[in-house]
Amino acid sequence: MQFPAFYVTGTDTGIGKTVASTALLHAVRARGHTAVGMKPVASGCVATPQGWHNEDALALQAASQPQPDYATLNPYALPAALAPELAAADVGVTLSLVPLQQALAQLRAQAEVVVVEGVGGWAAPLSAQLDQADLVRALQLPVVLVVGVRLGCINHARLTAAAIAADGLRCIGWIANEIDPQMERIEDNIRMLGQRLAMPCWGRIPWRPNAQAEGLAQHIRLPE
């Protein structure tokens, strides 16, 4: 695989980063590679006998082969469904890059490909001192942008791509994720996205609210 690890970000929160990330994991596995997910920071967790667990991180774990230890996949699991900076402060946690670098190194030793899912949109901070760009720089990862296809997505996608570039980071691909089944002229919007985003399209995920990640993998177009 050309990119053994990459960071999945989005044009906003709630636009389907986890849907895209789990589909990517299955698509990589369908090519015969081992692949594991990672959710460095997750807010909005539930208490379990094993500790705080997050729904999105569990989805990444389920789509991984081999399945990594949860604490390695999601080093910072924060209870409150708030921005990470607020959720961490609520429980007295200070986010640090070193544990995340160590966790990624462990995951890369376990699998050929690691799909790292970010939080919210690109500019959503991790803490008062850390932006996602700082994390991606520390992990030395390229970026894949998930575009939630709805009214306003062209503006959001262009702004996000420009912000990634301004941060000195490389966006290697984008994925169209259809999240509004009532959107008018969706084909025109996706065509315009393709014309205006400089990186290749890695796929178009159709609106299927109850679809399984393995089935959605067929809509992913991985680079050779």
Swiss-Prot record:
Claim: Nucleotidyltransferase is one of the keywords in the record: no
Pathway assigned to this chain's UniProt record: Cofactor biosynthesis; biotin biosynthesis; biotin from 7,8-diaminononanoate: step 1/2
A Pfam family matched in the record: AAA_26
EC number: 6.3.3.3
CC per GO annotation: cytosol
Residues bound to substrate: 43
Domain of life: Bacteria
Catalytic residue list: 39
Record-level Gene Ontology MF annotations: ATP binding; dethiobiotin synthase activity; magnesium ion binding
Cofactor dependency: Mg(2+)
Binding annotation for Mg(2+): 18, 56, 117
Alphabetical list of CDD domains matching this protein: DTBS (cd03109)
Keyword list, A-Z: ATP-binding, Biotin biosynthesis, Cytoplasm, Ligase, Magnesium, Metal-binding, Nucleotide-binding
Subcellular location: Cytoplasm
A single GO BP: biotin biosynthetic process
UniProt subunit comment: Homodimer.
Record-stated family: Belongs to the dethiobiotin synthetase family.
Name of the molecule in the record: ATP-dependent dethiobiotin synthetase BioD
